[in-house]
A protein has these predicted regions:
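Amphipathic alpha-helical "coupling" segments that flank catalytic cores
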Residues: 1-240
Length: 240
């Protein structure tokens, strides 16, 4: 890959020029096909993706696309493709997918990133994918997944077999053990943390905090009978 611009003015000029080029070609339906890309639009789009990511800053690409489209029309250059913005959005998403593959991000993480992608959050999405890819096969990743699976399997079974509704209304006043109290406190601490941070900026720390729940989650399930005969206690433990 060639170097991308780093100075603010150069970044702005590079991004707007590339998007303006793509808007013009997509606007007259001159788009790449599976076998042909005569105007190197795939390389142009990848240049936009790389410039955003390597400068470590989200940019409002959707707004730039809309503004560029309006300029063409205002200057009398009628764009005949009514699906221009959607098609260019999907094209850039596809280039982002390609970029993630080049960085050896796992397929399932790539697809999760693409499904929720906003063009205005490309760097944030990349960072999340990179951090998740890094942690998922580590011990911390194993801890996150095992904690989630153990809880979700019990919940799914109870909700399916006993038609119990979960309303997130845990009553700590009827806890019978410290294991319940410890899990309740851990959940409250995590909720408090997530309510006071920017998840996009603290993604790695957020994952590590989730991994840290394994001990208290497993102690709860190893020592507390969730499927209690007393319906009130059973529902409260499921709520927890």
């Amino acid at each position: 890959y060639s170097k991308v611009p780093k100075k603010a003015f150069s970044v702005a000029l590079s991004i707007t020029d590339k998007i303006d080029t793509m808007v013009g070609f997509f606007g007259i339906n001159e788009k790449p096909t599976s076998s042909k890309d005569p105007f190197a639009l795939r390389r142009t789009a990848l240049g936009v993706i790389r410039t955003v990511i390597e400068n470590k800053k989200d940019l409002k690409l959707n707004d730039i696309i809309k503004y560029s489209s309006s300029l063409y029309n205002d200057q009398g250059n009628k764009l005949t493709n009514l699906n221009l913005q959607l098609e260019l959005h999907n094209f850039l998403k596809d280039r982002f997918r390609y970029y993630l593959k080049e960085k050896e991000i796992r397929y399932d993480i790539i697809e999760a990133s693409i499904s929720s992608l906003s063009l205005n959050k490309i760097f944030s999405s990349y960072e999340k994918a990179r951090q998740l890819n890094k942690i998922i096969n580590s011990q911390q990743g194993v801890d996150i997944i095992s904690s989630y699976k153990r809880a979700s399997n019990i919940l799914e079974s109870e909700m399916r077999d006993n038609k119990i509704e979960i309303n997130n209304t845990t009553d700590p006043g009827i806890f019978k053990s410290d294991f319940e109290k410890n899990l309740y406190k851990k959940i409250r601490d995590i909720k408090k943390y997530y309510s006071t941070i920017n998840n996009d900026e603290n993604f790695e720390k957020s994952l590590l905090i989730l991994a840290d729940t394994r001990k208290v989650v497993f102690e709860f399930f190893d020592n507390v009978k969730v499927n209690e005969e007393n319906e009130t206690l059973r529902k409260n433990r499921l709520e927890l």
